[in-house]
From Swiss-Prot:
Record flagged with keyword Signal: yes
Positions of post-translational Isoleucine amide modification: 43
Protein name: Conorfamide-Ep1
Main location: secreted
Extra information: The mature peptide does not contain cysteine residue.
GO molecular function, one term: toxin activity
Tissues in which the UniProt entry reports expression: Expressed by the venom duct.
GO cellular component, one term: extracellular region
Sequence similarity: Belongs to the FARP (FMRFamide related peptide) family.
Species of the source: Conus episcopatus (Bishop's cone)
Length: 59
């Protein structure tokens, strides 16, 4: 596996771990990694989103 691929895999794992921590706090927020733009997208309660992520989710 290339260094870049390994880095993406590590980031995906980190996001998954963070999502698990959030789920335990019952925030109902799900994180997943989208490959096309390499963006972290947050799905869940809109009131829990930071302004930066809210801007990213507007299409």
């Amino acid at each position: 596996m290339s260094g870049c691929g390994f880095l993406l895999l590590a980031l995906l794992l980190l996001v998954t771990v963070e999502a698990t921590k959030m789920e335990k706090k019952n925030f109902g927020i799900l994180f997943y990694f989208t490959r096309p733009r390499n963006n972290f997208v947050r799905i869940g309660r809109r009131d829990m989103q930071s302004p930066l992520l809210s801007e990213r989710l507007r299409f």
